[in-house]
Amino acid sequence: MNSPLRGIWLWLPLLLTWLTPEVSSSWWYMGATGGSSRVMCDNVPGLVSSQRQLCHRHPDVMRAIGLGVTEWTAECQYQFRQHRWNCNTLDRDHSLFGRVLLRSSRESAFVYAISSAGVVFAITRACSQGEVKSCSCDPKKMGSGKDSKGVFDWGGCSDNIDYGIKFARAFVDAKERKGKDARALMNLHNNRAGRKSVKRFLKQECKCHGVSGSCSLRTCWLAMADFRKTGDYLWRKYNGAIQVVMNQDGTGFTVANERFKKPTKNDLVYFENSPDYCIRDRETGSLGTAGRVCNLTSRGMDSCEVMCCGRGYDTSHVTRMIKCGCKFHWCCAVRCQDCLEALDVHTCKAPKNADWTTPT
């Protein structure tokens, strides 16, 4: 082999490594490791040095993050429950989602945003519950305050969301900040949008004090809303996500279609169109929709026509136990009977030439 060709072959593996995108949020696997924080820190593959340092230095925060993974993945699956890609996770895969998030798609944008939001939520909650040594209630919410109803005293335990955001930024963004490529910038943007979304739903709660509930005195605190509000908000952002391209100097984005508005810090951004997720595809990581339950009467994404990609569906007759004939008995109980309900369940057919093994 001549010298130029030999040089190309020597460089090819490195070139492929550089060109192949990587799902960089390996910390997602923290929810599956279990055990002590040291076991967690040492057994999650792909953490960069600053993440491992934070992991060893703050084991109580890592426990909160690990528990939070279960919460935000469940929220992701709730939001995508009626779609072809249903945010399904893979056992024994440190990226949790497999190759599907290698594509810089809307789905990737949502997952990075909801995971970042989940870290903020989990850490902030752990702080308020006294489970983290390095933080507690928000120290800035002391003394008196004023709102449209008048003067009040700060009391109770205001959620220290600024600590949650600061720690989430340092931990979650660490690997992305080491990269200068387009995908790293996309992830950083969506991570930040996710963090901001939790703070958006911080609400003031108050308790009245005074004679006969006169509310002459009020004690107030700031509390995070249920995580479902954040999930619903990011779902709306997913549906309105903006496709972008890198600008010429490689430092930011510009819209792919000039007819659309420039993305704000609250918007989700993506580079690539999504696959249709209809069939199992090892290249894209799609598990397909064969075996998925569909809704025969729906006209939405969960309809048998859309979910099954026009392949048709199978119908099975099943029975299930339900509560029926419920009556209120004084005082104070509701008593029900157990009844069998017969219903039809419709599941998507597999492609005739597909290598299908298990439903998603």
Curated annotation (Swiss-Prot):
Subcellular location: Secreted, Extracellular space, Extracellular matrix
Free-text description of this protein's post-translational modifications in UniProt: Palmitoleoylation is required for efficient binding to frizzled receptors. Depalmitoleoylation leads to Wnt signaling pathway inhibition.
GO CC terms of this entry: extracellular space
Alphabetized SMART domains for the sequence: WNT1
Leader sequence segment: 1-25
Domain of life, source organism: Eukaryota
Keywords of the record: Developmental protein, Disulfide bond, Extracellular matrix, Glycoprotein, Lipoprotein, Secreted, Signal, Wnt signaling pathway
Lipid-substituted positions (O-palmitoleoyl serine): 212
Gene3D superfamilies according to UniProt: 3.30.2460.20
Protein name according to UniProt: Protein Wnt-2
